[in-house]
Amino acid sequence: MKKIVLFLHGYGSNGNDLISLKDYISLEKEETEFISPNAPEPCEFNYFGYQWFPLKERSIEELKEGLKTAFFHLEKIIEKIIHEHAVDETQISIIGFSQGSMLATYYALQKNLNFHSIISLSGSLPNEILNDLKISEIKSRFLIFHGKMDDVVPFNRAVETNSFLESKKFSSKLVLDDNCAHSISPIALDEINKLYEHWN
């Protein structure tokens, strides 16, 4: 069965940033398609980068409005993947970093699609947004990784997101790395491979 791993990069980055992770993911490369698109908008603060939505003020209201717009951009990407690769959503895992992981979680919780998994790396959502969502009844598994030394997105957001998911009876695993900043550590990669170990 074909597997799709969809990477969603962070703010100011591009699709090339995360695609190299495929070399560390223990999936049969012949059976797996790794897809890492650029976000739809040029980044305001990085000429060579892209953004899923603006982050000028970094306020909750800006985040809410940005996620609403980005939702439809991601929807088009996923619809195209399902059509072009003749797969259903259970054959898709979404790995997001920072802004990309916020979008992945936001999208998955509201869309009635059972993805194989949603992997959030250093970018969970605050309670102010989680509590406003209209949650779909889905069976997607969530893996939430965050470094405790992160000075860009506070790690307590990962704790909040995991608690929220557990309260809604989702399958969720929280992994905190004491020695990791706003990055992806070997511990995160190990956890991803554990999650994928029994992906048939």
Segments from the language model and where they lie:
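Conserved alpha/beta-hydrolase "acid-adjacent" motif
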Residues: 16, 151-157, 185
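Alpha/beta-hydrolase fold nucleophile elbow
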Residues: 86-96
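Short beta-strand immediately N-terminal to the catalytic nucleophile in serine-hydrolase-like folds
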Residues: 94-96, 121, 145
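Gly/Ala-rich beta-loop-alpha elbow adjacent to hydrolase catalytic centers
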Residues: 95-100, 104
